């Protein structure tokens, strides 16, 4: 029994990760990570969540829900910034927890993140499909139900657009990081300009009476809390999924130029931009129309613009937002493929996944992520996916918060002293852990249940395969493909 516990508690030598990941090309700069982060965080959710949360939970105080969620996300981002600067390894939280707590806990954290990437890829692709179909429907272009809805939903068999957009994104990423980064930078600029356009035009249509009362009176319906601080809290748990994309930056830190400076600037900079955009959109949206009018509205931004007489602006914003969803797919598929590569690198999943092609890209891992993303995105409905995204990620965030205490003890020894340091240590990591736990507790019962099932599957997989095939403390020798 002692041997078993010693095995699962084995910690990876950071020097070995440095050697294994040294074959990945370091090409990404601060501007690339800013684009990657903003593009991933500011995805489908900025055009949908403000209206949904306002109508279902918080009313005009949806802006407070976004602000409180941003505070929690910001605290996690501070821990991520120091971790990524000290340990710029592929796989982010998985690799960090592996080094600091041991293999089993690293696997649990990584398995939690893998759920995020699988579901987020499918979620964004499903949202892309819904928005694109809504955009072209007024001009008479409409797919048959069998090809436009997930299996078993409204007569659907497969969401073909969701499948195609995932395949196209995978094709782009398979060609190299430089091409993907250039595309990401252009699309993010377009997306931010579209959001700014909505805010400017929306300001001209604000009715101040829509903000009163700013925090509606609390009431409990059959399924949700609405109004009061209870409604704001319920909104925080739902909104938090909007901010989790900054992990995609850390997952690619092994490909960063000068990660000591690049990683903190990319993580904190992209989250700061996203917070400003989210709160601005939320405030303008609930000011344009009474929050109750956004109930069951899948495209509140476009609807509000059309109803206020700005149909042309609505078409422009929606068209750019649809194109801009590629940015979130790029970010999530990059991060997910690097996490699968990390599992293969360490033997916890088949080592086939860690193979690098002649461009030093883990395209085999990308292929697996693509196949699973296509299956989930084209077969499961948008609403089902939305509730599952943040649960696993929150578990990984709790691990990272606690790992700060282990990291500080090893900085200057077998780990470098990073250029960026988390402020208010040792208080802030504990506060971060408690706040993330509160956000997790506010998730719905189904999300927690599915998360538990996912972890049970992960533990079974680790005990049956990963534990026996682990390459812990094995120095990797890289053999270029022939």
Language model: regions and residue ranges:
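Hydrophobic transmembrane alpha-helices that form the core helical bundles
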Residues: 54, 64-65, 74-166, 171, ...
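Membrane-interface "cap" regions at the ends of multi-pass membrane proteins
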Residues: 1-51, 55-60, 74-78, 90, ...
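TM-loop-TM module centered on a large, flexible mid-protein loop between adjacent transmembrane helices
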Residues: 95-96, 101-102, 133-141, 145, ...
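C-terminal membrane-solvent junction of multi-pass transporters and transport-like membrane proteins
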Residues: 154-157, 352-363, 397-448, 468-481
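Hydrophobic alpha-helical segments and their helix-loop junctions in multi-pass secondary transporters
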Residues: 2, 130-138, 189-218, 283-289, ...
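Hydrophobic, membrane-embedded alpha-helices of multi-pass small-molecule transporters
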Residues: 28-47, 159-169, 205, 221-276, ...
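Transmembrane helix-loop boundary segments of multi-pass membrane transporters
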Residues: 54-58, 62, 126-130, 145-154, ...
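Membrane-interface loop-to-helix entry segments
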Residues: 129, 157-208, 267, 271, ...
């Amino acid at each position: 029994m002692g041997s078993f516990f010693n095995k699962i508690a084995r910690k990876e030598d950071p020097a070995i990760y440095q050697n294994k990941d040294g074959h990945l090309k370091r090409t990404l700069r601060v501007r690339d990570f800013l684009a990657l982060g903003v593009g991933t965080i500011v995805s489908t959710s900025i055009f949908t969540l403000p209206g949904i949360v306002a109508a279902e939970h918080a009313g005009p105080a949806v802006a407070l829900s976004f602000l409180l969620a941003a505070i929690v996300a910001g605290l996690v981002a501070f821990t991520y910034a120091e971790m990524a600067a000290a340990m710029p390894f592929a796989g982010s939280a998985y690799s960090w927890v592996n080094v600091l707590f041991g293999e089993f806990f690293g696997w649990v954290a990584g398995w939690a993140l893998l759920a995020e990437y699988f579901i987020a890829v499918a979620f964004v692709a499903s949202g892309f499909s819904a928005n694109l179909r809504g955009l072209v429907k007024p001009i008479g272009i409409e797919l048959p139900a069998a090809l436009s809805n997930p299996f078993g939903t409204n007569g659907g068999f497969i969401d073909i657009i969701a499948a195609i957009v995932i395949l196209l994104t995978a094709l782009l990423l398979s060609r190299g990081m430089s091409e993907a980064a250039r595309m990401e930078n252009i699309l993010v600029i377009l997306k931010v300009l579209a959001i700014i356009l909505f805010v400017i035009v929306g300001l001209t249509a604000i009715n101040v009476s829509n903000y009163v009362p700013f925090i509606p009176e609390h009431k409990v319906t059959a399924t949700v809390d609405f109004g009061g601080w209870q409604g704001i809290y319920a909104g925080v748990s739902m909104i938090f999924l909007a901010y989790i994309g900054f992990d995609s930056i850390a997952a690619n830190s092994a490909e960063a130029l000068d990660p000591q400076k690049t990683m903190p600037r990319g993580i904190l900079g992209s989250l700061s931009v996203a917070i400003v955009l989210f709160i601005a959109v939320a405030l303008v949206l609930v000011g344009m129309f009474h929050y109750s009018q956004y109930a069951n509205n899948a495209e509140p931004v476009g609807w509000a613009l059309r109803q206020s007489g700005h149909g042309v602006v609505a078409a422009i914003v929606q068209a750019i937002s649809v194109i801009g969803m590629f940015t979130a797919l790029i970010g999530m598929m990059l991060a997910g493929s690097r996490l699968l590569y990390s599992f293969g690198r360490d033997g916890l999943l088949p080592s086939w996944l860690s193979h690098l092609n002649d461009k030093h890209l883990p395209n085999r891992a990308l292929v697996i992520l693509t196949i699973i993303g296509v299956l989930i995105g084209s077969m499961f409905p948008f609403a089902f996916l939305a509730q599952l995204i943040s649960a696993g990620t929150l578990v990984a965030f709790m691990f990272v918060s606690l790992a700060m205490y282990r990291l500080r003890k090893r900085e200057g020894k077998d780990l470098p002293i990073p250029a960026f340091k988390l402020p208010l240590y040792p208080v802030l990591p504990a506060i971060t852990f408690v706040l993330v736990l509160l956000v997790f507790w506010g998730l719905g019962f189904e999300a927690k249940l599915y998360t538990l099932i996912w972890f049970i599957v992960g533990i079974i997989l680790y005990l049956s395969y990963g534990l026996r095939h682990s390459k812990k403390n094995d120095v990797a020798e890289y053999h270029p493909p022939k």
